[in-house]
Structures are given as C-alpha cells and as structure tokens.
Amino acid sequence: MNHEELINSLTKKMNGALQVLDADLKGLRVGQASAYFLDPVQVEAYNSKVPILQVATISVSDTKTILVQVWDKSLVKAVKKAIMEANLGVSIISDDNQIIRLQLPIPSEERRKELVKIAHKYQEKSKIIVRNIRRDGIELIKQMEQNTECSKDEAHIYSKEIQELTDKYCDKIDKIIKLKEQDIINL
C-alpha cells in the first residue's frame, strides 16, 4: 500500500465514523418528530425480535406526531408494547385499527441536559473510532518504514499527515456536536 492509498483508506474510514455519529444523533429527539426516532424499537413478531420497520410504516404527520401503520393487524399490540418498553418518552394518543399515533412531548430542561450528555457520549465514541483509525494508520507507516518501503523522514511526514487528518475529523465531530447541542438547548 502506498502513501496515497493509505490516506484515502483512512479518510474513507473516518468518514464512516462521521456517518455512525450522524446515525446515532438521528436517534436523539430534539424538538421535531422524525421517522428515525423509532429505529431502536424491536418488536416481538413471528417468534423473534425484529426492527419496527419490518412490521410497520413510520411517517411524520406534524412536528410532534409520528404515525405507525402496522401491516399485520395481529401485531398492533406487540408494536405498542415494544414502543412503550423502549422508554422513548412518547405517549400513544390513539390507535385506529392498524394506525398508532405517537405524541412527542416537549422535553423538559432536565431531559434536554440528559440529551446533551448523550450527544457528548456519541462525540467521545466517534473520536475514539477516529483515534483508533489513526493508530492503525501509524502502525502501517511503521511497518512500511521497517520494510524499507519508505524512509524515516517520509514516515515522519506521513505520520504528521495522519495526525492532521485526525485533527480535522475530530474538529468536524466537535462542530457537529456543537450544532446538535444548540438544537437541544433551543427547543
């Protein structure tokens, strides 16, 4: 693997860390209803636990209401139970046959602080992923140097480049979390 391929590979992996962070943050409800909000819900259906998206269609009717249209009428109770057990802080306001309406309350000040803490945990998790990618990249540089694929000076330059890439992605993570934090606080 040459220097350019290594940097491209590390960049791709670090972008993956940002995508994981984005997916984690979509699960945090901050003011507006989102179809992603129910992603963590697992429903007991057909003798196994399945994601809610495999048994229902999820849509948003307004900023505070999520509609869950269950495909199989026999699973409506299981879906309601799974939503309640997921502790998402939602209220089931009605269920007309196979459509379940979920009302999202405005988070209290305490809940907002809790959401900020969760966002910071996601931030640290993402930074750890990025740092682990950096560590792996630097290990590869050391191997390249030992195998005389690059000189000591080149290895130093490549390591510095990897560190700069790491700093860039850590800054991106910080900016994403800062925006999310402002969204949470300004509800």
Swiss-Prot record:
Keyword annotations of the record: Cytoplasm, Protein biosynthesis
Subcellular location(s) per record: Cytoplasm
InterPro entries xref list: Ribosome_recyc_fac, Ribosome_recyc_fac_dom, RRF_sf
Gene3D superfamilies, per the entry: 3.30.1360.40, Ribosome-recycling factor
GO biological process terms held by the UniProt record: cytoplasmic translational termination
Molecular function via GO: ribosomal large subunit binding
A cellular-component GO term for this protein: cytosol
Coiled-coil region list: none
Pfam families (UniProt xref): RRF (PF01765)
Sequence similarity: Belongs to the RRF family.
Protein task: Responsible for the release of ribosomes from messenger RNA at the termination of protein biosynthesis. May increase the efficiency of translation by recycling ribosomes from one round of translation to another.
UniProt protein name: Ribosome-recycling factor
Organism: Orientia tsutsugamushi (strain Ikeda) (Rickettsia tsutsugamushi)
